[in-house]
Amino acid sequence: MTQQYIVEPKKGLGLKLKKGQILKVVDVEGQQVADFVAYHAKDFYEHLDQGATIDANHSIHVKVNDHLYSNLYKPMLTLIEDTVGKHDLLLPACRPDMNRLLYGKQKDEFQDTCYDNMNRALEQFGVPKPHMHYPFAIFMNTVLDEKGNLSVETPLSNAGDYVRLRAEMDLIVAFSSCPIEKGKCNGDSVTSIRVEVS
């Protein structure tokens, strides 16, 4: 039986996954980033780690059959299907401090960030708030040029594109439908993400 959830624009979602369950993350309308983090269900010290994943896979890109690794270098999830092929493992989740520095926004100009969305989603499971979230940013199109310069470009995902991940251990996971509504990150608008668990 498949369970289905909608992550509304600018909102988050937290779930428990059992080892072997399949997680499908769908870009409903296209060009919408979904930040994703994962924690070991019984030991919150162990969590999805960008650096360990890059190191273990010898690549800044995750390909089908690659694992997403924890900070203890253990496989947490396996990418089993991907209709886009471009996601981000380099940048931290957006947060108020980032909005002030990169977008010149003042405190009263933003209400939601991926950092806050995922913290709220994880709170129900007792996961403590980290100093920062370093997510697998699904559908995010981060470009690294030959000089080492980074830029965030419009996502390559179209309506209905998806990734499927298999849990390799019992997990607590969280998503954020990225709230950045101006600029290329989400194609100048913010839309929904659909999550299916089977």
Swiss-Prot record:
InterPro entries: DUF1989
UniProt lineage: Bacteria, Bacillati, Bacillota, Bacilli, Bacillales
Protein name: Uncharacterized protein YcgI
Organism: Bacillus subtilis (strain 168)
Top-rank lineage group of the source organism: Bacteria
